[in-house]
Curated annotation (Swiss-Prot):
Keywords, comma-separated and alphabetical: Cytoplasm, Endosome, Protein transport, Transport
Keyword Metal-binding attached: no
Protein name: Vacuolar protein-sorting protein BRO1
Annotated InterPro entries: ALIX_V_dom (IPR025304), BRO1_dom (IPR004328), BRO1_sf (IPR038499)
Matches recorded under PROSITE patterns: BRO1
UniProt organism field: Yarrowia lipolytica (strain CLIB 122 / E 150)
Gene transcribed to yield this protein: BRO1
């Protein structure tokens, strides 16, 4: 395939030119309102400079051309003095030309669009995974673009957009499109030619032969056009006519070969000799094709090889076909073979047409690619005034028709509401068809089935279990702190000032505060648990009933209105359930049965017709509104300058009369249908059987509503309890973590206090021992003065108060930080990292040597704590 070269263009300053035009024609303020549109249009012009050989580049060029065409129709560039510079180069010679004409710009943009389409078609033709139809459509679109250029732009400053050149491009694109169109047919037909041993061999369609002849004819036309252009204008690629000539010869020869095979499939044997003549003719044409000069250039090597192989393969196929056909003719047909020169050419059939430019995209794709008209608001001032008046006329028309439709809908809704339709009609029809009273139906409403599918029984006991565990743990922590406080107090009472450890009450206040907070939380949580349990107990029977699932027969029994009413009824009551409906209408009065059987279908039919009538009316009005809103007569007004505005408006509004007439028809039809429906429904409601069924159905519905409301409340309570249970368990998990941290801190605190007490006791004992040794030394080696002798029968003097140590093993406990459990520190944080102290046995809390026992009755009990 032959792709066309792309042009190059330089930047154009659209922004300044358009802004100046609008400012001079409409005023500077109005020009400022188009700043965004002008900027978008300028970007479009810049984008086409880099448009590629793909669908994106195609869309960019088409979008710019459409917006440029719209702008040109809304301004008079010649009168306004707007003269932007458009610089484009020739696609082959690269000659640059600059002009101010918008037509020059449009012609070059269209050439670029056609060239990109040719490149897309050529690329898709080489892609085996691509549908040949895509390439076919691309070439047809390209042909349409070049046809548009030839029709609209007569004078071209550049050769590649001249009349003769673009018409030649049009023929080339059509030829390539038809070549892609008949590729599949050619492949199937040629495959049949090789099957010479079967009876059905040679059954090839004459249509394929004509299509190939059409391809050859189109390439011949393109060849002649390119040859004439090169001779007259000295312009063009020299390879174009060579390729076109080669394909012309090849497809003409292939058409002759396929046509020859189609003649062999004729019922008359007289055609067999003619078919051999066409085969010989195709061989001559293939020989001519093989001797043609081929294109030059490195980029044509692949084409030349492909062309030689194609012609050689076809020539071999033609020769083998000729050999087998002559053999069959000599043995069987004995038909006279005419000379190839006397045979006429195969009738060409052209199936391709240039796609009009406006049909290149489907409507939805056109809207997507082009987008909104950037300059739709840019119209002449007098047209703006006229369109404003016309818009008021359209609005008045819409309001009038809208009011008519609203009144018609209100009448329909009022009539149906008064008769209770369609609900009463469908319910009555169901009652009569079921053969039993609707009040005894045990169907469970869907909403209750939804409750039953979701509800499960709840177990609230984990709340109490969690609460008890936390309470036990917090009591253990409290007891541990209390025991330490008791021990410290006893040591202080015995050693007095010698026991330098700080009182427990001064350092355990924060821990005790944390314990109280946990206890208070447990009390509050317990109250909430009791409320939750009470709420659940109130709906527990209904919850247990729902939890048994949607197939629970007790649910159906509960909704059985007759079963429920019979339990509370004191005596027998006659209802329609006592009647025999098992035999359908036969159990009723024959006359009444016949009447209902006729009236019910009539009512149903009338109701459906009313529904369809209303839908049709809404659809018509929607279409009518859309038509009115999209109606733009600015072009008509521009072309009708000086005419009577009222006459123009009247003529333009006449196009909406068909919609008005259709709306009127639906309103009239609705009135007749309502009357028929009301008459039939009145007769139905007077029937005694119908009256009884309506009464029983109402009773059943009332009963069902009561039960549904009960289950609704139970379901809502269940959801609240379930949510409360989940939140309660989560609360207890958090509280358990808090209790664990308090317990760890209490244990570390007590261990630290006892270790501190051990150090203090050791210091006291050491000082006492040193003092005794000093006194003994003075007794043995002193001067013997009476002041140094101990008092007869007295106890030794108490040692002095030990000095406060600054190391880690003495003084105030350094391992407990009260701020960690202060009021501003949440429980959820990690407990403070205290210095780890081993837990000594109970009798080793304060060292190996126990302190002197206190006097009194508790002597033995006190000693037991240090052993």
């Amino acid at each position: 395939m032959i792709p066309l070269a792309l042009k190059t263009t330089e930047s154009t300053d659209w922004s300044r030119a358009i802004h100046r035009y609008i400012a001079s024609s409409y005023g500077p303020d109005y020009a400022e309102q188009f700043r965004e549109e002008i900027s978008s249009f300028q970007r479009l012009r810049q984008d086409i400079r880099g448009a590629g050989r793909d669908a994106t580049g195609r869309d960019i060029l088409f979008r710019y051309f459409a917006q440029l065409d719209s702008l040109e129709r809304r301004i008079n560039a010649a009168e306004s003095g707007m003269k932007p510079d458009f610089t484009w180069s020739d696609s082959l010679s690269q000659e640059k030309v600059t002009q101010h004409s918008i037509s020059f710009e449009k012609a070059n943009v269209l050439y670029q669009l056609g060239a990109i389409l040719s490149c897309m078609g050529e690329e898709m033709s080489r892609d085996d995974s691509c549908d040949p139809k895509a390439s076919f459509h691309a070439f047809q679109n390209a042909a349409g673009v070049f046809a548009f250029i030839a029709d609209k732009f007569l004078h071209a400053p550049l050769p590649d957009i001249g009349q003769d050149v673009v018409r030649a491009f049009n023929k080339l694109m059509l030829a390539q499109a038809q070549e892609m169109f008949c590729q599949d047919s050619i492949a199937k037909s040629v495959s049949v030619l090789t099957d010479v041993n079967q009876e059905q061999a040679g059954k090839v369609s004459a249509l394929t032969a004509k299509l190939c002849a059409g391809v050859g004819a189109l390439y011949k036309a393109a060849f002649e056009s390119f040859t004439a252009i090169q001779e007259e204008q000295k312009w063009g690629d020299k390879n174009w006519p060579l390729e076109c000539q080669g394909k012309n010869k090849y497809f003409t020869a292939l058409g002759s070969l396929l046509y020859a095979k189609s003649l062999q499939n004729k019922p008359s044997t007289q055609k067999f000799g003619e078919s051999i003549g066409y085969i010989q003719k195709s061989i001559n044409e293939f020989n001519e094709a093989s001797m043609l000069p081929l294109p030059n250039g490195a980029n044509k090597k692949d084409f030349n090889k492909w062309y030689r192989d194609l012609v050689s393969t076809a020539l071999d196929l033609a020769r083998s076909t000729l050999k087998s056909s002559e053999h069959d003719n000599d043995l069987i047909y004995h038909s006279l073979v005419p000379a190839p020169a006397t045979l006429g050419a195969v009738e060409p059939k052209e199936v391709v047409t240039a796609t009009p430019l406006q049909d290149m995209y489907k409507e939805e794709d056109h809207v997507r690619v082009v987008g909104r008209d950037l300059f739709t608001r840019l119209v002449p001032m007098h047209v703006l005034q006229q369109t404003s008046v016309y818009s008021e006329e359209k609005a008045s028309l819409l309001r009038s028709e809208g009011e008519r439709i609203e009144v018609a809908d209100q009448k329909l809704n009022s009539a149906l509401e008064y008769m209770g339709l369609p609900g009463e009609l469908y319910a009555l029809k169901k009652d009569l068809q079921s053969g039993r009273d609707s009040g005894s139906s045990a169907q469970v409403p869907a909403v209750v089935l939804g409750y039953a599918s979701e509800v499960k029984t709840l177990d609230l006991s984990p709340l109490k279990t969690s609460r008890d565990q936390i309470l036990t743990q917090i009591r253990d922590s409290q007891a541990l702190i209390a025991s330490e406080e008791t021990e410290s107090t006893k040591m202080k009472d015995y050693y007095k000032d010698g026991w330098t450890q700080a009182p427990s009450a001064q350092v355990n206040a924060s821990l005790l505060s944390d314990i109280r907070r946990v206890q208070e939380s447990l009390v509050a949580a317990g109250a909430s648990d009791e409320k939750l349990q009470a709420q659940y107990d109130g709906v527990k029977p209904d919850i247990e009933l729902l939890s048994r699932g949607i197939n629970n027969p007790e649910l159906e029994k509960l909704f059985d209105a007759d079963s429920s009413s019979s339990k509370s009824s004191s005596g027998p009551s006659e209802s329609l359930i006592d009647l025999d409906f098992s035999q359908g209408a036969a159990s009723r009065d024959p006359a009444a049965s016949s009447t209902l059987d006729k009236l019910l279908p009539s009512c149903e039919t009338s109701f459906r017709k009313l529904q369809n009538c209303q839908k049709d009316r809404q659809a018509i009005f929607y279409e009518f509104k859309d038509k009115v809103h999209r109606d733009d007569i600015s072009g008509v007004l521009v072309n009708s300058k000086g005419a009577d505005d009222n006459l123009i408006f009247e003529q333009e509004l006449e196009k909406f009369q068909p919609y008005q007439q259709r709306l009127t028809a639906t309103i009239n039809t609705q009135a007749l249908l309502i009357k028929d429906l009301a008459d039939s429904w009145e007769k139905i409601t007077r029937d005694p059987v119908v009256k009884n069924k309506v009464t029983d159905r109402k009773r059943a519905l009332d009963h069902s509503h009561v039960i549904v409301e009960r289950f609704r409340k139970a379901f809502e309570s269940w959801k609240q309890v379930k949510t409360g249970l989940d939140k309660g368990l989560e609360f207890y998990r958090d509280l358990q973590n808090m209790a664990d941290k308090v317990n760890v801190s209490a244990t570390q605190f007590v261990n630290a206090r006892r270790q501190e007490g051990k150090s203090i006791l050791s210091a006291i004992q050491s000082n006492t021992t040193n003092e005794l040794q000093s006194q003994l030394g003075r007794l043995s080696f002193g001067s013997g003065s009476s002041s140094a002798a101990p008092t007869s029968g007295g106890a030794p003097t108490l040692p002095p108060k030990p000095q406060q140590h600054t190391g880690d093993n003495y003084g105030q406990p350094s391992t407990y930080d009260p701020s960690v459990y202060g009021p501003n520190s949440p429980f959820m944080q990690q407990p403070p990292q205290h210095q780890q102290y081993g837990q000594p046995p109970h009798h080793q809390q304060y060292g190996q040597n126990p302190p002197p026992p206190p006097q009194g009755a508790n002597q033995n009990q006190f000693w037991n704590q240090y052993r």
